Design a protein with these regions (language model features):
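RNA substrate-binding interface of SAM-dependent RNA methyltransferases
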Residues: 2-93
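Structural alpha-helical scaffold elements that stabilize or flank donor/cofactor-binding regions
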Residues: 99-100, 119
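Low-acidity, Ser/Thr- and Arg-rich intrinsically disordered low-complexity segments
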Residues: 154-165, 169-174
Length: 174
């Protein structure tokens, strides 16, 4: 999987996500934004009928990758030039105020419990979506859509800058 990726690539590491409706919504969003979905070793998460129905065709368009144990997976992703970002409710960098890298793995935690603390600590950075405070957070599927759209906006901004200067990067000129 890693060898076939271009210079810009986005992946979602789903840590503990278990609700098939959220999984289906995440698959549809991942398909829309061209992200791969990484499933941890030992995760019972799999494509069910309910997830496929919610994904509405998105499941067939997404690369699903079953990861090796976390330490191995993190090492391989970093060697491939990925930065890992833990998505957290509080205490992270403001998603809308940071520059996102071209190769990014967003680690999305379980509904309610969040992600494994050791996995969050192993990430290169922590990102949060600022909100009004009326609710504690978005659910994992809604948060995934916000994170992926922000990364896509970074990518679109890069294309616009290249066009404005008369240069079009080969990776975006397809």
């Amino acid at each position: 999987w890693l060898h076939g990726l271009g210079p810009a690539a986005l992946a979602l590491w789903l840590d503990g996500v278990g609700n098939p409706h959220n999984f289906g919504a995440i698959l549809r969003t991942a398909a829309h934004f061209g992200a791969s979905v990484l499933l941890p070793a030992g995760s019972p998460l799999a494509l069910s009928g309910a997830a496929a129905r919610v994904a509405e065709g998105g499941a067939e368009a997404v690369t699903l990758v079953r990861l090796p144990p976390s330490v191995e997976a993190i090492d391989a992703l970093r060697r491939a030039g990925f930065q890992l970002a833990a998505t957290v409710v509080r205490g992270g960098e403001d998603l809308f105020a940071v520059e996102l890298p071209a190769r990014l793995v967003l680690v999305m935690g379980a509904e309610g419990e969040g992600m494994d603390a050791a996995l969050a600590a192993a990430c290169d950075r922590r990102l949060s979506i600022p909100g009004s405070g009326a609710v504690e957070s978005l659910n994992v599927a809604a948060a995934t859509a916000v994170f992926l759209s922000r990364w896509a906006a970074r990518k679109a901004s890069t294309r616009s800058s290249s066009r404005a200067s008369g240069l079009i990067s080969r990776s975006w000129a397809r």
